[in-house]
């Protein structure tokens, strides 16, 4: 409203008061108005023309306080609504008077927060008592069938018409509060005294702040047109509940429809607080951040109401669209004595080109104190929480406002800012805690990896190979994560290469094992006599093969006891152990012992024996033992162990043997024993090579997996067999007649017995080539069995 209009209205108001004092009407009886009798005697004070202003009933002039607020009122002066016509003609005013005279409560719909500068709060319930009595009288004569909004068209065109209201009557833009006030008046309870309206934004007028909401237009349009629009279209005060079919939009399509539900809250007015000055109290809504700032108030309290400084609310920067369908019978407010109401703040439709995120707005806390003359019997401490949201269809803005109101004091109540929202410091602390936990977990895993790698393990002793390869890391060096990861990678690669090599070696060993197993199975399943049984030696003369291998033909070693080891030889006395892996089918040939004995396997051996026999001829000897080759080779001289049927009769006669021949015979016997021991040793090693091919490369290693003796015992047995062979050859040399002539040999033997045994075995042994045959036989067996010199370890 422009200042000229405002000043003119103030002048009109003062003129009406002076006129009422100087020219009281004849119908105006102050006593009648004080006790509430006969209110129909005067014109309705809501709308009075310029000519009828002199008949306005005023009982007395209200006393004006220090700030221009009247201290007491009569019924006429305290009646809440006055219509001042400055430019309207008398006929229009009278027509309005005739339409509204029967509906005095219609004027409650009008709102103008900038005109009523002379009215103020009451300090008693005197006016409410009078208002209740007059309301009961008018309720019987008021006709609800008359449309209260018919007046809006005539009032809408009046530019200087201003309708004021008393600040203590409750106003609700949805009709709920007016309905509550009307019900209170008709039920003799009266409206809630000393109440004001609380919103999100406050402005201050010249001398008085009146509660209102700029619902349709901006604050610059807060004039009579604004008040008439609210009266004519938005608030269905009385017909909203009784006649829901009537809506402001149906009466006037120019007014906007309801799209959002606005809300205001009723708060009891606190006591006067002269310590607080509201001259600098301002609230602003920032378009960029939507934060509510209060420059004139200390934090966190953003506003405190008092009886002298009422708070008016508007939205100067945004337009508000109200909901189309207001609740009819809903009442969001509890009884006044509880003073605990929860409503939603008005929702504004904000047009903005920026894209905002969801913003939680922290609003201030407002504390108020109830008046002593209020309806509550005893003061009670209660708080009211009001939350509002501002949403925009174009940009996702969410704004919530929270008010905590204390009804019995002026101290602000509410939670601290840290409890409302997490501060950036607390968020940063939570983030740091998560990062610290992540780092500690990572360091633990790195430490486990360091202990798993041998080159990084604590207390690891490096070898020369590690130092040469450069894989050793000194313990004094501080390890970092990069070093640990690199060494772990190298260790994994080395394990992979070793694993690959072991897999290849395992394949080779599996192949060899299959070959050895097949050889052993072939030797055991041969149709000839098994080697195990041949080692025990079957008794008697077993006929052998006619075809003897060349390697066996070169051997001249053999005794009758050797037929247990080599049954396949042409003669048991001249056989050499044969590999059991070369079985041959037996050839049964009917041969006489004479024919078999005439077979000489080795020429050199025969020549040697012929020399011995020519030197020491023996005509006949029954003492020829089983180990004598001469008796077998020359049965005519020695007779041997032949059957009597095959030996001539003259051979059966006893013959004389010289002592020299007897010594020679004994020497030959010792020699034959030595040869037999060597042959047995060869057979024993051959069996071990067949049963344990892994140890075939070394002649000193035998894993006795088959025989029930340990490897150490086998080594001792082998050494004893060799020693026995040496002794046999030594005894052969010493017992011969030629040996007795060499006394120096005996002295050497007595002095160096052990050395003499080995020397005599290697030098003085006549069949020294037998050792060569033994080595050749062993090499032949190894080559034919496809046995390598050893297995790589």
UniProtKB/Swiss-Prot annotation:
Principal location listed in the UniProt entry: cytoplasm
PROSITE patterns in the cross-refs: BHLH (PS50888)
Domain of life of the organism encoding this protein: Eukaryota
Sites of Phosphoserine modification: 344-345, 355
Gene3D superfamilies: Helix-loop-helix DNA-binding domain
Keyword Membrane part of the UniProt annotation: yes
Domain bHLH span(s) in chain numbering: 426-495
Post-translational modification: Undergoes proteolytic cleavage by rhomboid-type protease rbd2 and is released as soluble transcription factor from the membrane.
Pfam families according to UniProt: HLH (PF00010)
Low complexity bias (residue ranges): 376-400
Keyword terms of this UniProt record: Cytoplasm, Membrane, Nucleus, Phosphoprotein, Transcription, Transcription regulation, Transmembrane, Transmembrane helix
Residue ranges of the TM segments: 719-739, 748-768
Modified residues (Phosphotyrosine): 356
Summary of the function given for this chain in its UniProt record: Putative transcription factor.
UniProt protein name: Putative transcription factor sre2
Gene (name only): sre2
């Amino acid at each position: 409203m422009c200042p000229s209009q405002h000043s003119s209205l103030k002048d009109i108001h003062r003129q009406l008061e002076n006129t009422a004092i100087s020219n009281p009407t004849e119908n105006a009886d102050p006593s009648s108005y004080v006790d509430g009798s006969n209110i129909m005697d005067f014109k309705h004070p809501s709308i009075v023309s310029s000519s009828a202003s002199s008949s306005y009933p005023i009982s007395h002039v209200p006393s004006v306080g220090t700030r221009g607020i009247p201290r007491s009122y009569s019924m006429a002066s305290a009646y809440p609504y006055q219509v001042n016509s400055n430019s309207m003609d008398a006929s229009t005013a009278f027509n309005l008077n005739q339409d509204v005279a029967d509906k005095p409560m219609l004027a409650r719909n009008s709102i103008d927060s900038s005109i009523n500068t002379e009215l103020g709060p009451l300090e008693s319930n005197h006016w409410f008592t009078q208002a209740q009595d007059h309301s009961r009288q008018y309720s019987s004569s008021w006709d609800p069938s008359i449309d209260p909004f018919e007046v809006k068209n005539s009032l809408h065109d009046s530019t200087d018409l201003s309708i004021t209201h008393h600040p203590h009557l409750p106003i609700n833009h949805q009709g709920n509060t007016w309905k509550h006030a009307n019900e209170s008046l008709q039920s003799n309870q009266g409206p809630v005294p000393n109440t004001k309206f609380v919103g999100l934004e406050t402005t201050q007028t010249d001398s008085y702040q009146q509660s209102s909401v700029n619902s349709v237009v901006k604050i610059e349009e807060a004039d009579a047109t604004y008040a008439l629009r609210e009266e004519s279209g938005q608030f269905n005060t009385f017909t909203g509940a009784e006649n829901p079919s009537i809506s402001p939009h149906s009466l006037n399509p120019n007014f906007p429809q309801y799209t959002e539900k606005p809300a205001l809250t009723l708060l009891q007015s606190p006591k006067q607080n002269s310590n607080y000055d509201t001259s600098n109290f301002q609230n602003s809504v920032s378009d960029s951040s939507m934060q509510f700032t209060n420059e004139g108030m200390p934090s966190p309290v953003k506003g405190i109401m008092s009886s002298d400084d009422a708070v008016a609310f508007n939205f100067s920067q945004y337009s508000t669209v109200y909901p189309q369908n207001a609740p009819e019978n809903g009442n969001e407010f509890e009884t006044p004595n509880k003073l605990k109401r929860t409503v939603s703040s008005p929702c504004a439709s904000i047009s903005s080109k920026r894209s905002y995120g969801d913003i939680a707005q922290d609003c201030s806390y407002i504390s108020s104190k109830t008046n002593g003359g209020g309806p509550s019997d005893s003061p009670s401490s209660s708080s009211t929480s009001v939350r509002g949201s501002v949403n925009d269809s174009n940009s996702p803005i969410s704004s919530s406002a929270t008010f905590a109101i204390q009804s019995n004091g002026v101290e602000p109540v509410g939670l601290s800012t840290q409890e409302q929202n997490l501060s950036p410091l607390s968020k940063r602390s939570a983030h740091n805690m998560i990062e610290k936990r992540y780092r500690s977990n990572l360091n633990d895993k790195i430490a486990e990896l360091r202990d798993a790698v041998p080159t990084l393990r604590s207390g690891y002793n490096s070898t020369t190979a590690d130092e040469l390869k450069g894989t050793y890391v000194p313990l004094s060096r501080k390890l970092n994560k990069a070093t640990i990861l690199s060494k772990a990678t190298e260790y994994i690669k080395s394990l992979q290469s070793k694993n690959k090599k072991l897999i290849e070696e395992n394949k080779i060993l599996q192949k060899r094992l299959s070959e050895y197993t097949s050889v052993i199975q072939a030797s055991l399943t041969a149709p000839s006599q098994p080697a195990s049984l041949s080692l025990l030696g079957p008794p008697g003369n077993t006929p052998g093969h006619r075809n003897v291998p060349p390697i066996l033909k070169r051997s001249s070693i053999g005794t009758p006891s050797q037929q247990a080891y080599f049954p396949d030889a042409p003669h048991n006395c001249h056989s050499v152990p044969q590999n059991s892996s070369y079985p041959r089918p037996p050839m049964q040939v009917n041969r006489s012992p004479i024919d078999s004995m005439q077979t000489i396997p080795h020429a050199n051996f025969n020549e040697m024996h012929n020399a011995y026999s020519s030197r020491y001829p023996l005509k006949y000897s029954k003492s020829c033992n089983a180990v004598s080759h001469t008796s077998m080779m020359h049965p005519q001289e020695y007779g041997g162990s032949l059957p009597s049927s095959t030996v001539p009769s003259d051979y059966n006669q006893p013959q004389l043997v010289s002592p020299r021949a007897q010594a020679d015979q004994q020497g030959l016997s010792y020699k034959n024993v030595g040869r037999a021991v060597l042959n047995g040793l060869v057979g024993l090693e051959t069996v071990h090579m067949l049963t344990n091919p892994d140890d075939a490369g070394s002649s000193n290693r035998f894993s006795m997996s088959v025989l029930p003796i340990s490897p150490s015992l086998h080594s001792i047995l082998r050494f004893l067999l060799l020693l026995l062979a040496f002794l046999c050859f030594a005894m052969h040399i010493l017992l011969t007649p030629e040996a007795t002539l060499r006394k120096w040999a005996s002295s050497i033997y007595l002095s160096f017995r052990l050395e003499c045994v080995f020397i005599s075995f290697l030098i003085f042994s006549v069949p020294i080539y037998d050792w060569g045959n033994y080595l050749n036989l062993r090499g032949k067996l190894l080559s034919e069995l496809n046995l390598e010199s050893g297995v790589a370890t």
